[in-house]
Design a protein with these regions (language model features):
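Short hydrophobic alpha-helices and adjacent helix-cap/hinge residues
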Residues: 1-175
Length: 175
């Protein structure tokens, strides 16, 4: 059963800190424990890449089997060491970024495709530019179609295979 969600974050990145805050508020409502660890700063005060494998080991020791990688420029830049360290510790990475599944070792991505988000933005822009609407009059729109991508090589390594009905709607890739 899914009881713990891991998160590595960088408090010096606003997006990363916001995601930590959001998950801190959301996980108790879902009955899930959030195990969040900050990426250790190095001697320069910037996040230390070498701390990523150490933090993954800590997450494993705390019983984390699933890890969320959200918005973090630092972790995205170091996605290869991030995802491979997770897999080495038996932790599955879930992310909204398809490239982590396609080009690294994340297990699963559920994401709005960029072209769909661009289409929504264009529709909103047309309402403003062509139809003369004020931006404040427009409702907030959200993507309704999502891409499900799963890395089957990682699924095999972790022995975490998705249900068959999920595979019918997901795109399975091998890195």
């Amino acid at each position: 059963t899914f009881r713990k969600l891991g998160l590595l974050y960088n408090r010096n990145e606003k997006n990363s800190a916001v995601k930590f805050q959001e998950l801190s508020e959301l996980t108790p409502k879902l009955g899930v424990e959030l195990v969040a660890l900050e990426v250790e700063p190095g001697s320069t005060g910037l996040p230390d890449v070498a701390s990523i494998p150490l933090r993954m080991k800590e997450l494993k020791e705390k019983g984390v089997r699933w890890l969320y990688l959200g918005s973090s420029s630092f972790l995205d830049k170091n996605r290869e060491i991030f995802t491979s360290s997770a897999v080495e510790n038996g932790i599955a990475v879930v992310s909204p970024y398809e490239r982590l599944v396609r080009k690294s070792h994340a297990l699963l991505s559920v994401a709005a495709r960029y072209q769909d988000v661009g289409r929504l933005a264009a529709q909103q822009a047309l309402k403003i530019l062509r139809d003369g609407k004020k931006p404040s009059e427009l409702p907030i729109v959200r993507a309704t179609d999502f891409a499900y991508v799963i890395n089957m090589e990682v699924a095999k390594k972790l022995n975490r295979f998705p249900p068959f009905n999920f595979l019918q709607i997901a795109e399975a890739v091998k890195k």
